Regions:
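Acidic/histidine-rich alpha-helical segments that form the ligand environment
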Residues: 83-122, 135-136
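"A position-specific structural signal for the A-helix of alpha-solenoid helical repeats
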Residues: 189, 223-226
Length: 241
């Protein structure tokens, strides 16, 4: 889903680097699964596909930060589905070793781009987008990794591991960004995961908490497709009214 704007904080650089380090460590889970075996089904991504995809969007975030630091126009990302298809196609013939190496390099590239930016640069309004410059990092860092770990484990039929990945994402996010709006976003994101899985009883407490922390999220939630699977539940209907 598109991500609602987060909120600027102090020591943004440190916080971003902490989430990136946590993500880099956790991504070893996918690296260990990455090999050159083809997918058993055309629509199912391999671990190699996931790694290549995640690396591409980290490089995109690094390019945005580098452009801001240099005073240049920032790259756009309007046709996300088209870009994703191109990335997947381009990586079909690459070896697992190549993809792993590129994924590791993308972490170093993004970390360097964060380090190069000043706090003022990170807190500037993002060109052509809502929110601040630094907000390009979480959706292309730990939040993105957690999402794809969930996709991977769901495809393997391991609901417990998929859920654990979402809890990890929430914990990393809340440890780094402790203001009410960011805490609300962490709760909302977890609630959306449960809602997409049709688990209304698990989703609703997190959605409710997100509204308590950041009431404006309710306007977003009213049209968020991630919640469509639970809207007819009486309790969900009540909190979304």
């Amino acid at each position: 889903m598109p991500y609602p704007p987060l909120v600027p904080e102090t020591e943004v650089k440190r916080r971003l680097l902490e989430t990136l380090a946590a993500s880099r460590e956790r991504e070893r889970e996918l690296e260990n699964l990455c090999d050159d075996a083809p997918s058993p089904a055309p629509e199912r991504w391999t671990a190699k596909d996931h790694l290549a995809h995640l690396a591409h969007w980290r490089r995109y975030a690094a390019d945005v930060l580098a452009a801001v630091h240099a005073g240049n126009p920032t790259p756009g990302a309007d046709d996300v589905d088209g870009v994703n298809a191109e990335v997947q196609a381009a990586n079909q013939e690459r070896s697992a070793a190549e993809v792993k190496k590129a994924a590791q390099a993308s972490y170093a590239e993004l970390a360097a781009a964060i380090e190069d930016c000043s706090e003022d640069e990170l807190l500037r309004p993002r060109q052509g987008r809502d929110g601040a410059v630094w907000e390009v990092v979480p959706p292309n860092g730990h939040l993105h990794l957690g999402e794809h770990l969930g996709f991977w484990h769901d495809a393997q039929g391991d609901e417990g591991a998929a859920e654990e990945a979402q809890l990890w994402t929430r914990d990393v996010h809340e440890a780094a960004f402790t203001d009410p709006k960011s805490l609300a976003f962490g709760a909302y994101n977890l609630g959306c995961y449960y809602a997409r899985s049709g688990r209304a009883a698990d989703a609703i407490p997190h959605i409710r908490r997100s509204f308590e922390l950041h009431p404006d999220l309710k306007d977003w939630a009213r049209t968020d497709k991630d919640l469509d699977g639970i809207r007819d539940e009486p309790e969900a209907h009540a909190i979304l009214a």
